Regions:
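A shared catalytic/ligand-binding motif for oxyanion handling
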Residues: 1-115
Length: 115
């Protein structure tokens, strides 16, 4: 991974939407108002097309609403997704509190191997 340039600054927001459509709509408005480059999301309503990168079960996502925040790479795992941009890898993770301890430890182990 290449080190980020010194003069790059990203505005990053993080939120758990609880699978609520109204919360996601409000988030998109806040993103526009604040000029966010990256939004790390858990339990999104659903991906909103271009600029959204989600794991297979739509529990973790990263939204890149700003066109200048171009992604370089992305990867999806069980409970997580990452996007690499400007030499920085950003993860969004969600592990259900209803998972068994065995499932949770397996998911954490998979994430740890990826990092």
């Amino acid at each position: 991974m290449t080190p980020p340039p010194e003069d790059i600054m990203m505005r990053i927001l993080q939120i758990n939407l609880g699978h609520c459509r109204a919360a996601q709509d409000l988030l998109l408005q806040v993103v526009r108002e604040k000029g966010a480059d990256v939004v790390i999301v858990s339990e999104q309503w659903k991906g909103s097309g271009a600029g959204w990168y989600a794991n297979a079960d739509d529990t973790a996502a990263i939204c890149l609403p700003n066109k200048r925040a171009a992604k370089w790479h992305t990867q999806v795992g069980c409970g997580w997704v990452w996007v690499e941009m400007s030499g920085v890898r950003i993860y969004s993770c969600y592990f259900s509190p209803n998972s068994t301890q065995q499932d949770f430890l397996g998911e954490i182990s998979n994430l740890e191997r990826d990092i």
